[in-house]
A protein has these predicted regions:
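Active-site acidic carboxylates
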Residues: 1-117
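Alpha-helical scaffold elements lining the catalytic groove of polysaccharide deacetylases
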Residues: 120-122
């Protein structure tokens, strides 16, 4: 695998691709899909993510104390799934993630504060 990686990096470099842009001057915290549907162990899609939620809560405290941007994402579908595209056919178990249900809300242990964005992805 290392040979593949090195050859890919060399190919990218020869084409002027793969440069780094740095970290910028204002970091943001993006919390992806820490909704009840995934973090609640009683959910059909859930697991034991207590440790991950606890670590995320610590990160949230740091970002909020520093007044840095925090953005959450969740997966949510309309009841008729017209917004689901073909992905719902690939992963039909996601059909329990309906807009307005408890399962698509962000876990209360890291709940968004007023002004923090929640992006619904499909």
């Amino acid at each position: 695998m290392n040979d593949w990686y090195e050859s890919t990096r060399a190919d990218y470099a020869s084409k002027g691709l793969g440069s780094r842009s740095g970290y910028g001057i204002k970091p943001a915290l993006l919390i992806v899909d820490f909704s009840n549907g995934f973090t609640d162990s009683t959910s059909p899609l859930g697991g034991d993510f207590d440790r991950q939620v606890a670590v995320t809560a610590r990160l949230l405290t740091v970002f909020r104390d520093g007044q840095l941007p925090v953005v959450f994402t969740t997966v949510a579908y309309e009841p008729d799934f017209r917004d689901a595209g073909v992905f719902i056919k690939k992963v039909p178990s996601l059909s329990i993630l309906l807009q307005g249900s408890h399962l698509v809300e962000i876990d209360d242990r890291i709940a968004p504060l007023k002004g923090e964005s929640v992006i619904v992805n499909k």
